[in-house]
Regions:
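C-terminal accessory domains and tails appended to enzymatic cores
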Residues: 80, 216, 223-295
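Short catalytic helix/loop segments, enriched in acidic residues and glycine
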Residues: 47-67
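Boundary at the C-terminal end of the N-terminal hydrophobic targeting segment
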Residues: 18-23
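Bacterial N-terminal signal peptides
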Residues: 7-16
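Active-site glycine-rich loop that binds ribose-phosphate moieties when present
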Residues: 145-171, 177-180
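A glycine-rich helix N-cap at a beta->alpha junction
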Residues: 99-117
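Mature N-terminal segment immediately following signal peptide/propeptide cleavage
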Residues: 24-44
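Active-site rim beta-loop-alpha module in soluble metabolic enzymes
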Residues: 167-175, 179-225
Length: 295
């Protein structure tokens, strides 16, 4: 073999061997997408599989994900994992998602809205989120399920956004952008400092003042770009450990049953609490309780 050919072969082998390592070094981003806070959705029916205009809601949801994905990839190659986080978690139009992402679908998963998120991710994005249960002007305000009236982590009242941010923080991942209705943005950014986009303006829990979807998606793209530009200064939201969890429910019969779980204590007729050694342990048990009270 001629020397030049031999050197070319060596260069090819070296580049082939380096390719997997280079792929592994790509930044990884996690997107959790709920539905109530998606722009253009102004009635609860649009978030339900049997509701009027649900298919339009799915299309709007998919469009917002693609807007953020486009902003991420405009800055360079990246790995992006999208986790459907609403209801049965089978809402996004998979065939209309940007083909460069991977997608988790289905509700039976240990970590629900943050399934797949671990310490290998550079940052997380929360899209389509809503405010916590009891928020007076929050559009479809709830915390996990309608049966939950309040959730506290280490004496801090949280909604789904803060709960998921606390989990992300426990694995060292900062949330750098969040989007949802105006009540969610106002509430979430009090606790977690992120680039935020109000996709609509909550009027009541059943109605909202909407922006055109194109306007919302343009704002999401711009906000994602700013969030990525400032990523180096972002810090995970960490609540520490152990994690004391307090859950207030609407049904006092349920609290009687939940206290039978080892480590769970009934505080009053509607409230139970427990202490978990880690945020992951706390999250799993909260998920179990949600599933139980939603039956």
């Amino acid at each position: 073999m001629r020397q030049s050919a031999f050197l070319s072969l060596l260069a090819f082998v070296a580049s082939a061997a380096a390719a997997p390592a280079q792929a592994q070094r790509l930044p990884r981003y996690f997107i959790s997408v709920d539905m109530e806070g998606i722009g253009g959705i102004g009635t609860p029916a649009m978030t339900s599989a049997n509701g009027k205009d649900y298919e339009l809601g799915r299309k709007l949801m998919t469009g917002e994900v693609n807007a953020v994905v486009g902003a991420i990839l405009q800055r360079g190659p990246a790995e992006i994992l999208v986790n459907d986080s609403h209801g049965d978690m089978q809402n996004l139009l998979h065939t209309e998602l940007d083909p460069r992402v991977t997608y988790i679908q289905g509700a039976v998963k240990p970590f629900g809205m943050v399934e797949g998120l671990d310490s290998t991710f550079a940052a997380a994005f929360f899209l389509g989120y809503h405010s916590r249960a009891g928020t007076p002007n929050g559009f479809i305000a709830q915390t996990g399920t309608g049966a939950v009236k309040g959730l506290w982590l280490n004496d801090i009242e949280v909604g789904e956004g803060e709960l998921n941010a606390a989990y992300a923080g426990s694995v060292g991942v900062p949330v750098i952008m969040a989007a949802g209705d105006s009540a969610f943005v106002e509430q979430f950014t009090r606790t977690v400092k992120v680039e935020a986009v109000a996709t609509k303006y909550a009027v009541t829990p059943q109605s909202a003042r909407l922006l055109h979807p194109k306007v919302v998606q343009e704002r999401l793209t711009a906000a994602a770009g700013r969030a990525l530009a400032n990523r180096s200064s972002a810090k995970p939201w960490v609540i520490g450990k152990p994690v004391k969890v307090r859950l207030r429910l609407s049904d006092n019969t349920v609290t009687q049953i939940l206290q039978a779980i080892p480590g769970v204590r009934q505080v009053d007729g509607f409230t139970v609490e427990f202490t978990a050694p880690t945020m992951a342990d706390a999250y799993r048990l909260i998920r179990l309780m949600y599933r139980f009270v939603s039956v």
